[in-house]
Curated annotation (Swiss-Prot):
Homodimer or homotetramer. This is Polyamine aminopropyltransferase. The gene is speE. Its main location: cytoplasm. One of its GO terms (cellular component) is cytosol. Pathway: Amine and polyamine biosynthesis; spermidine biosynthesis; spermidine from putrescine: step 1/1. It is found in: Cytoplasm. It comes from Bacillus mycoides (strain KBAB4) (Bacillus weihenstephanensis). HAMAP family: Spermidine_synth (MF_00198).
Length: 275
């Protein structure tokens, strides 16, 4: 008998993967957590029925969240990741030699625990001496921070459950306060096919707070529609004006200095969402 998992991305559309075995399943304090081994994408983390990451395609998302803002900032030393308990963004952050400290604030400690167990290639960096892991509410952590971080990355789930507060204008205002005077932040902002209104709303809210606000995309096969967006807000540095000498060699599978600029070239229907 074959076992298949289907994520219903809308009421009428979804993505299906063949499952070899279930590694762990649990109702945590915050969400339903499943870790499964798939035939095509390796081990897969699923939260509340939604694919969060897989061993096969995780590098796309994690590289694009981390490297776009980190190469935009001239000297990122203190970095905060809100969410991201699988550790993938932290792994990419630590590839930048200027980074002296990376703080991870994840509300669900079980995500960290089982990512370390079943996704070691992704979560291994959480044990690095430069990393401080805090299990707690990222919204509250931001509210309690001021003029502290060079770069803040919001690696959240969809705007449901514990992540709802991470898609509000008040949260973005708090991020601005938590950043230094030339700070940068980035957040994943879903896809333009099924949630166009989210992209429009977030971009508008961020633009009212940050003088430089841009949208960029990446192709992620296991995420809804495969086309994913990220919104970047910056107080001073424009991601489209990064000098050539700022790019240094790091090991990546998706991100390149050429792709850095290309990611901001939007299909017309996507660009129309933020006009």
């Amino acid at each position: 008998m074959e076992l298949w998992f289907t994520e219903k991305q809308t009421k009428h559309f979804g993505i299906t993967a063949r499952i070899n075995r279930t590694l762990h399943t649990e109702q945590t304090e915050f969400q339903k957590l499943d870790m499964v081994e798939t035939e095509e994408f390796g081990n897969m983390l699923i939260l509340d029925g939604m694919v969060m990451t897989t061993e096969k395609d995780e590098f796309v998302y994690h590289e694009m969240v981390a490297h776009v803002p980190l190469f935009t900032h001239p000297n990122p030393e203190n970095v905060l990741v809100v969410g991201g308990g699988d550790g993938g963004v932290i792994r990419e952050v630590l590839k930048h030699p200027s980074v002296k400290k990376a703080t991870l604030v994840e509300i669900d400690g079980k995500v960290i625990e089982y990512s370390k167990q079943y996704l070691p290639s992704i979560a291994g960096a959480l044990d690095d001496e430069r990393v401080e892991v805090k299990v707690g509410d990222g919204f509250l952590h931001i509210a309690e921070s001021e003029n502290e971080y060079d770069v803040i990355m919001v690696d959240s789930t969809e705007p449901v459950g514990p992540a709802v507060n991470l898609f509000t204008k008040g949260f973005y205002a708090g991020i601005s306060k938590a950043l230094k005077e030339d700070g940068i932040f980035v957040a994943q902002t879903d896809n333009p096919w099924f949630t166009p209104e989210l992209i429009t709303t977030v971009f508008k809210d961020v633009k009212e707070i940050f003088p430089i606000t841009r949208l960029y995309t990446a192709n992620i096969p296991t995420y809804p529609s495969g086309l994913w967006t990220f919104t970047i807000g910056s107080k001073k540095h424009d991601p489209l004006e990064v000098s050539e000498e700022r790019f240094h060699e790091i090991e990546t599978k998706y991100y390149t200095k050429e792709l850095h600029n290309a990611a901001f070239a939007l299909p017309k229907f996507v660009g129309d969402l933020i006009k």
